[in-house]
Amino acid sequence: MSIYPMYTRKITHWFARRSFQNRIFLLILFTSTIVMLAMSWYLTDITEERLHYQVGQRALIQAMQISAMPELVEAVQKRDLARIKALIDPMRSFSDATYITVGDASGQRLYHVNPDEIGKSMEGGDSDEALINAKSYVSVRKGSLGSSLRGKSPIQDATGKVIGIVSVGYTIEQLENWLSLQISSLLIPMAIMLLLLLFCARRFSLHIKKQMLNMEPQQLSQLLIQQSVLFESVFEGLIAIDSDYKITAINQTARRLLNLSQPEPTLIGKRISSVISQEVFFYDAPQTNKKDEIVTFNQIKVIASRMAVILNNEPQGWVISFRSKDDINTLSLQLSQVQQYADNLRAVQHEHRNLISTIAGLLFLKRYNQALELIQQQSESHQKVIDFIARNFQDNHLAGLLIGKYYRAKELGLELIFDPACFVDRLPTALSHNEWISIVGNLLDNAYNASLRQPQGSKQIECLINSDGQEVIIEIADQGCGIDEALRDRIFERGVTSSASKDHGIGLWLVRSYVEQAGGSIVVENNIPFGTIFTLYIPLTRDEHHG
């Protein structure tokens, strides 16, 4: 069994156990090292080739210059070894060549750096081209001093006859020393480059880790799968858009609520304005989050929120969540009929209990006439109010609300007075019964609370509701505590209230939302001497170009 596959598996297993950040770092380090080694090999090869060429040309030029010296030609012709030595020794001392050799026409040495070699034949077998063909050239051969790079040139007399040869050589060992010096000069820059690559690799791996939220790929993959399942499983419609207002994600609930038949891939990349016909909500105040606003998406009333995705203090996109208004019960149930009817029934029960107790006391005292008179008085008073409401308010939901609010006022020690001009035979088409009752109920509740907080004012609340003409007019006047000037401009904002209770701050915001939805307007004035007058103008038929 080969050890190589086993060793490879161990390395692979060890590498797989490293964190993603370290794997990226090691991979870049390995790749960088391979590249650096390849570059080193290439530079070494190029440098060696260039060095051999340059040194070879240097040896050749020296050999040609020496062989052309008239003094040397004359000395070789006379075989004057002393003269040859006197000519060559100074040159060798100034040259960087390892050796300079001079031979005769038969290749026997006339001069050599080693005197013992004089008279012997030149080694290497590469002198024939110079001696026979009178050529100058560069060769690499092994001689008496070892392998060397040598330049050879013939010595010719005045007639052109070859009478000798000059060989200038550089040993391979000397060339390798020079090559090592040149390569070593590159080691520091290459080491600096390698360290820079290591630093960049580390920074890059840290950047990748940061971009992946410090998670491993499998963790990120699992998170994306979980978020995808969560995105599709919530009951709210969810839409994600980028900074160019193009859809990047939309869940199944959103497509169902908006009656969109296209699958998600078809909607991805489309501008939100081409899919949903409510542009103000998406484009208004891009850096501000919106929460629980009543808007209309594709002619469907929804309660929507918008959350900005902020990166480097700039919005990179938004996530819009919404639910059909018909499905929202948290606000409507608390601010409309369920809570109101419970309060109204308690008020009626409380007043009837007090009345029965009073009548029982009169009967016990045998004051029958006074008991009968009280019964008739209460019956006439209540009947007048009930008859007035039944006659002037033809919507049963509104009539029931007003009767309950009348008894609730009496329970609180207040008096709800209806203006004789009250008359409602139709309601705005843009509002449902629930929304309409929420408007009136919240205005009356607000007036009750304000009146209870003002000990000096009258305890009367005046109510006018009239649908004559093209709009419904609602006017609620109280003698309560009024509106703080610091809150007057913000009284209709969600969560803004002058009450200490955490449950307040929603009613007037809801009133404004419904009125604006129906294309109406609200006027707030100070009452004299105390209190506030709220006047609402709501068109019976909504102007489609409004808002």
From Swiss-Prot:
It comes from the Bacteria. The modification Phosphohistidine is found at residue 350. It holds the Pfam family sCache_3_2. It is an enzyme of class 2 (transferase). Residues 347-542 form the Histidine kinase domain. Gene3D superfamilies: Histidine kinase-like ATPase, C-terminal domain, PAS domain. Autophosphorylated. Homodimer. In vitro CitB and the CitA kinase domain form a complex, formation of which is enhanced by ATP. This is Sensor histidine kinase CitA. It comes from Klebsiella pneumoniae. The gene is citA.
